[in-house]
């Protein structure tokens, strides 16, 4: 199973086109948040319409897709305090067996087999949410999603990946950046122990001093491709899954290519 991983696209037309053209060469495309750009001169409503069309084009190529929300993906008029957990625009089209949207745990079917995917929404509220009409806390919602992801992994015998925009704090994936959300990410990944977790948010992590694109946190392999400057091809990771504890990950960005392999143990 070949999975293309990235994040922080910020409605960069060049990056979107590159991924659209590359997606058919892979079994699935996963994006860990920040599809929109709140600093762009293009209105956010127009941005989200373009992103949804782009996603549909990827799906029409016959490949699978999943995304989670990032801090750029919420805006007034689409989301209000104490409302749904995820940006409404990201859920305008229902999920299917080949598409997992924000705030879900589902079995994602690909041409080469299944993949358990959990997509954690950005904690825009930092407190209570309304999920399916019921008030709950963000922590309880996340625990519910992770429990469901673990169940899919165990029952289906498939690898499990968690998408969460914020990288785990105190790891090279966040470089020197630290926020309370980063500590929260580290704690939930430590507790859930998925096979992989995909993050973003810190664009420069793979190329800055003390930063890197891959880190093992307990049994979980955490990934952050980082992101390039506007107009450049996107930083990305190609994950080729061959079986439990047998996979290859290749990071490409900033004119460099780095490789990590697991044949029982991780080698970078």
What residues fall within each predicted segment?
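Proline-aspartate-enriched helix->loop->beta-strand connector
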Residues: 28, 185, 189-199
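A short helix->loop->beta-strand "cap" motif at the edges of active sites that frequently abuts
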Residues: 60-65, 193-195, 217-220
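Conserved catalytic scaffold of divalent metal-dependent phosphoesterases
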Residues: 37, 73-184
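Short, Asp-centered acidic motifs that coordinate Mg2+ and/or phosphate
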Residues: 3, 27-28, 97, 159-161, ...
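Active-site-proximal beta-strand elements of phosphoester/diester hydrolases
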Residues: 2-10, 113-126, 161-165, 220-227, ...
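Binuclear metal-dependent phosphoesterase catalytic core
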Residues: 105-113, 188-191, 205-268
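Core catalytic region of metal-dependent phosphoesterases/phosphodiesterases
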Residues: 6, 11-110
């Amino acid at each position: 199973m070949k999975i293309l991983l990235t994040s922080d696209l910020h409605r960069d037309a060049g990056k979107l086109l590159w991924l659209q053209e590359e997606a058919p060469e892979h079994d699935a495309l996963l994006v860990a948040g920040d599809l929109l750009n709140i600093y762009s001169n293009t209105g956010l409503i127009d941005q989200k319409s373009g992103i949804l069309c782009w996603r549909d084009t990827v799906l029409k190529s016959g490949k699978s897709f999943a995304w989670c929300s990032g801090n750029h993906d919420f805006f007034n008029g689409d989301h209000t305090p104490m409302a749904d957990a995820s940006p409404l625009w990201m859920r305008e089209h229902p999920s299917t067996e080949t598409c997992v949207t924000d705030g879900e745990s589902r079995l994602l079917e690909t041409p080469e087999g299944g993949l358990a995917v959990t997509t954690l929404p950005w904690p825009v509220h930092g407190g209570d949410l309304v999920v399916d009409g019921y008030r709950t806390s963000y922590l309880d919602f996340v625990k519910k999603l992770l429990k469901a992801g673990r169940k899919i992994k165990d029952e289906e015998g498939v690898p499990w990946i968690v998408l969460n925009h914020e990288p785990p704090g105190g790891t090279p994936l966040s470089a020197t950046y630290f926020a309370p959300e980063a500590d929260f990410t580290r704690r939930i990944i430590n507790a859930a122990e998925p096979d992989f977790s995909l993050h973003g948010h810190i664009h420069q992590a793979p190329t800055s001093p003390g930063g890197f694109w891959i880190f093992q946190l307990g049994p979980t392999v955490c990934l952050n491709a980082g992101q390039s400057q506007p107009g450049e091809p996107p930083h990305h990771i190609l994950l080729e899954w061959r079986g439990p504890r047998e996979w290859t990950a290749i990071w490409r960005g900033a004119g460099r290519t780095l490789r990590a392999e697991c044949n029982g143990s991780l080698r970078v």
